[in-house]
């Protein structure tokens, strides 16, 4: 019998195709599925919890406005993202900038982004 470490080492050495076949074989052998219903349930529970307490807020960039460069600079400052990542985020609005933060911090971020010319929502 193989130890857990030996199994992990064997999995590390497999190709993506081999891993896919392994997952299918495990699903068939044990009658389980690798789908993620747990993630869906976890997301729903987190949403219900946030609605009940409302102590955590999300800052959503609704629109970058006309001064995208200023908005990108502020997004980089707030998130610590690189230039390309911040530009992609600003170009593909609406997108969350920060999630699960206190109301005071959300208001500060909103003010900074609006000062740069962006339209922002707090949810």
UniProtKB/Swiss-Prot annotation:
GO cellular component annotations of the record: cytosolic large ribosomal subunit
Descriptive protein name: Large ribosomal subunit protein bL12
Pfam families to which the protein is assigned, alphabetical: Ribosomal_L12, Ribosomal_L12_N
PANTHER family for the chain: 39S RIBOSOMAL PROTEIN L12, LARGE RIBOSOMAL SUBUNIT PROTEIN BL12M
Keyword Ribonucleoprotein found: yes
InterPro entries: Ribosomal_bL12, Ribosomal_bL12_C, Ribosomal_bL12_C/ClpS-like, Ribosomal_bL12_oligo, Ribosomal_bL12_oligo_N_sf
Function: Forms part of the ribosomal stalk which helps the ribosome interact with GTP-bound translation factors. Is thus essential for accurate translation.
Subunit organization: Homodimer. Part of the ribosomal stalk of the 50S ribosomal subunit. Forms a multimeric L10(L12)X complex, where L10 forms an elongated spine to which 2 to 4 L12 dimers bind in a sequential fashion. Binds GTP-bound translation factors.
Organism in which the protein naturally occurs: Geobacillus kaustophilus (strain HTA426)
Keywords: Ribonucleoprotein, Ribosomal protein
Record GO terms (molecular function): mRNA binding; structural constituent of ribosome
């Amino acid at each position: 019998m193989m130890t857990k470490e030996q199994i992990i080492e064997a999995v590390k050495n497999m190709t993506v195709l081999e891993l896919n076949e392994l997952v299918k074989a495990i699903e068939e052998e044990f009658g389980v599925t690798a789908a993620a219903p747990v993630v869906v349930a976890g997301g729903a529970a987190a949403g219900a919890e946030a609605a009940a307490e409302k102590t955590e807020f999300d800052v959503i960039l609704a629109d970058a406005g006309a001064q995208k460069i200023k908005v990108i600079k502020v997004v980089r400052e707030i998130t610590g993202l690189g230039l390309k990542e911040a530009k992609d985020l600003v170009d593909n609005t609406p997108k969350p900038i920060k999630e699960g933060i206190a109301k005071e911090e959300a208001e500060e971020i909103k003010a900074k982004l609006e000062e740069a010319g962006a339209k922002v929502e707090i949810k």
